[in-house]
């Protein structure tokens, strides 16, 4: 039923049934809107570094940042599954560090965590799952490691990269993930992985053959400075908001705001107060 709480187990069971709808959101108002729209998953992404905090990349995002924004999203959204990104440096040092970071996110409302990387981090995935926290994998273009793996370019367009993608996906499944995000890989490679693994795949810029799709909230509504080519802008909210603030500024400068309807009056005369 649409009103039922979405869990990691429910997402797992959705593979092959109906498309999973996921949105990346970062704060109370965007999460509240996404929940009202009926999405299945809200990802509190470390992309908040660029989208919300103005950083040049995700590398500047800290665990404290993720905890703060995850808590805000969790206060707003009640039905969707809330997944929190594990930021750069929060799980790489050791499995114990990974569990500690995941627990910090779970304590403020994350119902699952997402981490980037393949077989090299399978032990971190297993440790977090063994601690009782569901894990979503992330393969293909992994922004935290984009420079190391050749920059922001499409992945798995050739056989060797596609084979590596599949092996990493299988490794994550063995470690216990309940789903895998495939970012900016060829549609054919995404389709192959989707067919070959038993967990749902959720695409971002990876074509139409996955079990679900995810886009950043700000890209959907037109609030991003730069919309990626694989995203679709459904409304130009930036233009609407600029127009609204411009009208407000004009009203203040011309004495039209506040109006009588915005004013609170005293209950008795105040002129003779000394």
From Swiss-Prot:
Homodecamer; pentamer of dimers. This is 3-methyl-2-oxobutanoate hydroxymethyltransferase. It comes from the Archaea. 3-methyl-2-oxobutanoate binds at residues 46-47, 85, 114. It is found in: Cytoplasm. Catalyzes the reversible reaction in which hydroxymethyl group from 5,10-methylenetetrahydrofolate is transferred onto alpha-ketoisovalerate to form ketopantoate. One of its GO terms (molecular function) is magnesium ion binding. Its EC number is 2.1.2.11. GO terms for cellular component: cytoplasm. The lineage of its organism: Archaea, Thermoproteota, Thermoprotei, Desulfurococcales, Desulfurococcaceae. Keywords: Coenzyme A biosynthesis, Cytoplasm, Magnesium, Metal-binding, Transferase. Gene3D superfamilies: Phosphoenolpyruvate-binding domains. GO terms for biological process: coenzyme A biosynthetic process; pantothenate biosynthetic process. It catalyses: 3-methyl-2-oxobutanoate + (6R)-5,10-methylene-5,6,7,8-tetrahydrofolate + H2O = 2-dehydropantoate + (6S)-5,6,7,8-tetrahydrofolate. Mg(2+) binds at residues 46, 85, 116. It comes from Aeropyrum pernix (strain ATCC 700893 / DSM 11879 / JCM 9820 / NBRC 100138 / K1). Belongs to the PanB family. The keyword Metal-binding applies.
């Amino acid at each position: 039923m649409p009103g039922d709480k979405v869990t990691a187990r429910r997402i797992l069971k959705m593979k092959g049934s109906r498309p999973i709808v996921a949105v990346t959101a970062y704060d109370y108002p965007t999460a509240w809107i996404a929940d009202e729209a009926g999405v299945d998953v809200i990802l509190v992404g470390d992309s908040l570094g660029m989208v919300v905090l103005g950083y040049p990349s995700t590398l500047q995002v800290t665990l404290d940042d993720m905890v703060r924004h995850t808590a805000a999203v969790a206060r707003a959204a009640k039905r969707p599954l809330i997944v929190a990104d594990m930021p750069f440096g929060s799980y790489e040092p050791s499995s114990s560090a990974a569990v500690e970071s995941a627990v910090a996110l779970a304590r403020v409302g994350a119902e699952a965590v997402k981490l980037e990387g393949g077989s090299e981090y399978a032990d971190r995935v297993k440790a977090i799952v063994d601690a009782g926290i569901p894990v979503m994998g992330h393969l293909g273009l992994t922004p935290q490691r984009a420079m190391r793996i050749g920059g922001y370019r499409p992945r798995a367009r050739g056989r060797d990269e596609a084979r590596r993608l599949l092996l990493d996906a299988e490794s994550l499944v063995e470690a216990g993930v309940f789903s895998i995000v495939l970012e900016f890989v060829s549609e054919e490679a995404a389709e192959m992985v989707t067919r070959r693994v038993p967990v749902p795949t959720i695409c971002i810029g990876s074509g139409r053959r996955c079990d679900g799709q995810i886009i950043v909230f700000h890209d959907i509504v037109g609030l991003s400075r730069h919309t990626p080519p694989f995203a679709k802008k459904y409304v130009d909210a930036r233009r609407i908001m600029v127009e609204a603030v411009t009208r407000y500024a004009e009203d203040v400068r011309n004495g039209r705001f506040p109006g009588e309807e915005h004013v609170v009056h005293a209950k008795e005369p105040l002129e003779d107060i000394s």
